[in-house]
Amino acid sequence: MGLVKVIKNKAYFKRYQVKLRRRREGKTDYYARKRLTVQDKNKYNTPKYRLIVRITNKDVVAQLAYSKIEGDVVVASAYSHELPRYGLKVGLTNYAAAYATGLLLARRHLKTIGLDSTYKGHEELTGEDYNVEEEGDRAPFKAVLDIGLARTTTGSKIFAVMKGVADGGINVPHSESRFFGFDQESKEYNAEAHRDRILGKHVADYMTYLKEEDEDRYKRQFSKFLAAGLNADNLVATYQKVHSAIRADASPAAKKAAKPSKRHTAKRLTYDERKQRVADKKALLLQLKEQQE
């Protein structure tokens, strides 16, 4: 079939239908969303849970949600800016922090639904691919990965979050082919390399290299790490302590009491207050008039 030229006449514009708003804005892939949210027709009132992962410039966002007609319902969430509670104050957007955020989300949600003791996940970090197996009367919590419009690049931080969730005890259907350490040519997976990546060994190695080559640049580039007491010798151990702290207590921090905001506009008076203000002004004017007389 040859190329058909689109004739933009009155009939074309009369029948033209715009795409959905979030598609026009380039925010939602509805082809993927339909397949991630629509449940099997033989399942009734059974939500299809999604593991939503978003990487921003300053944060790693991980959520568990399901869709309704009114909109998505978020049942659990974890953010990398929560990691300072567990001993990690800097480097909150790197690969190791992404894994820790996923682990935090999994342990937090399983605690909420009472499955944290049944499904403890992969407690010893080896880097090996781990899939949750059913134990006891209750099946493991299942969620499918939702990456939005991000690219599925091998070794991406998105898959670090997924690895953390899977190791935390949630069933996320996946394969090892997108993890760091998987060789596309030989089709082999290097679990040891992935483990080192999760524990930030690549950062520690670069810190050692940079300190030897250019100490001024080292102090400048890793100034926040050094201020937090982190160096190449204790970085890996710090991430291990963070994982242990998350498994010990993954509950969210208590919300601080909201402070009353400062008012920059005049408070609106009630009817009785306005009436009283008029009466006071009249009384003052009468008093001034009497004094003049």
Swiss-Prot record:
Biased composition (Basic residues): 256-267
InterPro entries on file: Rbsml_uL18_euk, Ribosomal_uL18_C_euk
Cellular component GO terms held in the UniProt record: cytosolic large ribosomal subunit; nucleus
UniProt keyword Cytoplasm, yes or no: yes
One Gene Ontology molecular-function label: 5S rRNA binding
Family classification: Belongs to the universal ribosomal protein uL18 family.
Summary of subunit composition and partner proteins: Component of the large ribosomal subunit (LSU).
Protein name: Large ribosomal subunit protein uL18
Species of provenance: Caenorhabditis elegans
